[in-house]
């Protein structure tokens, strides 16, 4: 059980997940649950987070790391080429052990020249789809039925002008979406949230990193403050109606 959230921001990319892994012989028979790492940074440049078989995620992360070291992305000069290279790395590795389709999907963030990109590698067939500034969020995993409507509401309320969020806004929304899903899911998705960001550093180089516990706590506090502010709207709804303005009598002409 997993929830993944990815956002394209005006100045970066955010990917987050829950922290829960379930044990058991199959999806219908679970034994125990524990906290694990689900969001990974490869070579300080790529962010990966997967849903599905844990072993497939381990293999995919290792294969991407090896490909980067071997300059396997050197010919990927446009985002679609980089995304196809990621897909091919995974598909070829999975095929080597005859893994069936539908066992693993992922979100990936990566730089291509002066662009920062978010790609969804579909659970059904691992085919890549780039997210854009018009379609700037994605979610995957068993928590998707909760996160998609929530993210859609965030887009409608905060970004009705069509612009994507800033990185700071994206970290806030990702944290809120993960906390919301962790709170409401029927089982198998638990905290704490794990979040990584890809952005250009002060030198102008792309840099991917996991946010620190202190940074996560700051965003969680912002979410709690927003929820408290929303809750206070009840006072407005339940307030007595304002008294009507007194009518000023009209004096007859003299």
Give residue spans per PLM region.
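Conserved phosphate-donor
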Residues: 98-100, 104-120, 186-189, 193-200
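Short Gly/Thr/Asp-enriched flexible loops that form oxyanion-binding sites at enzyme active sites
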Residues: 123
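Conserved short S/T/G-enriched processing/targeting/catalytic segments and their helical context
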Residues: 1-102, 126-172, 186-187, 206, ...
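Charged C-terminal helix
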Residues: 179-213
């Amino acid at each position: 059980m997993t929830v993944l959230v990815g956002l394209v921001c005006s100045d970066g990319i955010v990917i987050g997940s829950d922290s829960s892994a379930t044990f058991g012989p199959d999806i219908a028979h679970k034994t125990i649950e524990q906290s694990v790492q689900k969001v990974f940074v490869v070579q300080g440049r790529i962010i990966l987070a997967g849903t599905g078989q844990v072993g497939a995620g381990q293999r995919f992360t290792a294969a991407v790391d090896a490909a980067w070291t071997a300059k396997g992305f050197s010919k990927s000069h446009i985002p679609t080429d980089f995304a196809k290279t990621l897909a091919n790395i995974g598909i070829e590795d999975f095929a080597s052990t005859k893994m069936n389709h539908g066992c693993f999907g992922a979100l990936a963030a990566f730089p291509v020249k002066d662009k920062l990109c978010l790609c969804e590698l579909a659970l059904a067939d691992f085919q890549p789809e780039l997210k854009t500034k018009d379609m700037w969020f994605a979610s995957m995993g068993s928590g998707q039925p909760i996160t998609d409507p929530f993210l859609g509401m965030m887009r409608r309320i905060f970004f009705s002008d069509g612009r994507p969020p800033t990185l700071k806004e994206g970290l806030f929304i990702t944290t809120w979406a993960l906390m919301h899903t962790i709170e409401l899911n029927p089982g198998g998705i638990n905290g704490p949230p794990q979040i990584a960001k890809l952005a250009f550093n002060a030198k102008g180089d792309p840099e991917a990193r996991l946010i620190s516990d202190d940074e996560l706590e700051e965003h969680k506090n912002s979410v709690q403050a927003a929820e408290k502010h929303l809750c206070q709207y009840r006072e407005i709804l339940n307030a007595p109606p304002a008294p009507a303005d007194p009518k000023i009598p009209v004096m007859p002409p003299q």
